[in-house]
UniProtKB/Swiss-Prot annotation:
Family affiliation: Belongs to the LDH/MDH superfamily. MDH type 1 family.
Organism: Candida albicans (strain SC5314 / ATCC MYA-2876)
Origin superkingdom: Eukaryota
Main localization (coarse): cytoplasm
Official protein name in the record: Malate dehydrogenase, cytoplasmic
Miscellaneous: Has antigenic properties. Elicits a specific immune response in systemic candidiasis human patients undergoing malignant hematological disorders.
Catalytic function, reaction form: (S)-malate + NAD(+) = oxaloacetate + NADH + H(+)
Active site (catalytic residues): 184
Binding site for substrate: 86, 92, 124, 158
């Protein structure tokens, strides 16, 4: 029996993510939690004739923790798209304070009710919210770094799509699986186009085209916000990306081997390759790298990729590391308040 809980299931990302998860044959039970509108989402999804059982959980009021506890109880995988999107006039700090509090509250619920679950964090800013979840679980004595994932998959999805769009006659987006390292916002996002099968195409681009491509991957979210006239952000593509990582983890749990995905993880020495990775990223506690997945989560960090990157990518990495340090510290200090 595999139970998946989605926290923030009625939101812009939560709804399509819940739909995709409902269709996964590896899922037996789907628990949908949100503070608004979730009974309707649950009723709607429950009519789909896939085999997973769907249940929605709505707290009676702000103080009610029983709904969250029931949603989480017995969950094997928890996905967190909860939070508020940035509204006009809202600073990044405003957004951070709201989402950080939401994520911390949910992490406390996980610690109490499903401490062994795999936890996938989508709520932005991921560079800070993942450290908050780590600190919260650690404070409760139930932290396993191999089971905590910051979802950066949208950066990989965009990196694959955007290079393919420059070579429409020769390639399809599915031809690529670009490794994207660093973090999950702006200049902390470093796509490694110089490696693997993207190299032959990337190398023939002009310097200007290369810069534009990197910038597009780093700031692709802005394109969607503009196209939606400020009325929303990247929700469908984000739901797909979050689902892709969840699907990979569920496949690994079911015994599929050789699954590698990039994720923003805690470079804890208990994970194979993490200590070596730290040395290459100025001793950062968290960083996004390709990892090998197994039945118990992350089995190995594929750090060697950082020794193979181009000089241009090394420069991008330096900028990313500097910003990441601040983002991580911000999350840690919030959690320790």
């Amino acid at each position: 029996m595999v139970k998946v809980a989605i926290l923030g299931a009625a939101g812009g990302i939560g709804q399509p993510l819940s739909l995709l998860t409902k269709l996964n044959p590896n899922v037996d039970e789907l628990a949908l939690f949100d503070v608004v509108n979730v009974p309707g989402v649950g009723a709607d999804l429950s009519h789909i004739n896939s085999d997973s059982k769907t249940q929605s959980y709505l707290p009676k009021d702000k103080e009610d923790k029983t709904a969250l506890a029931a949603a989480l109880k017995g969950s094997d995988l928890v996905i967190i798209p909860a939070g508020v999107p940035r509204k006009p006039g809202m600073t990044r700090d405003d957004l951070f304070n709201i989402n950080a509090s939401i994520v911390q509250g949910l992490a406390e619920g996980i610690a109490a009710n499903s401490p062994k679950a795999f936890v996938l964090v989508i709520s932005n800013p991921v560079n800070s919210t993942v450290p908050i979840v780590a600190e919260t679980l650690q404070a409760k004595g139930v932290y396993d770094p191999a089971r905590l994932f910051g979802v950066t998959t949208l950066d990989i999805v965009r990196a694959n799509t955007f290079i393919s769009q420059l070579f429409l006659d020769q390639t399809k987006p599915s031809d690529f699986n670009i490794n994207v390292v660093g973090g999950h916002s702006g200049e902390t996002i470093v796509p490694l186009y110089s490696l693997g099968n993207s190299k032959q195409y990337y190398d023939i681009l002009s310097e200007e085209q290369k810069k534009e491509l990197i910038k597009r991957v780093q700031f692709g979210g802005d394109e969607v916000v503009q196209a939606k006239n400020g009325a929303g952000s990247a929700t469908l593509s984000m739901a797909y990306a979050g689902y892709r990582l969840a699907e990979s983890i569920l496949a690994a749990v079911n015994g599929k081997t050789d699954i590698v995905e990039c994720t923003f993880l805690n470079l804890d020495s208990s994970i194979k390759g993490a200590s070596e990775a730290r040395k290459l990223v100025k001793d950062l506690d968290f960083f996004s790298l390709p990892v090998q997945l197994g039945k118990n989560g992350i089995t190995e960090v594929k750090y060697d990729i950082l020794n193979q990157i181009s000089d241009d990518e090394k420069k991008l990495l330096e900028v990313a590391i500097e910003q990441l340090q601040k983002n991580i510290e911000k999350g840690v200090s919030f959690a320790k308040k």
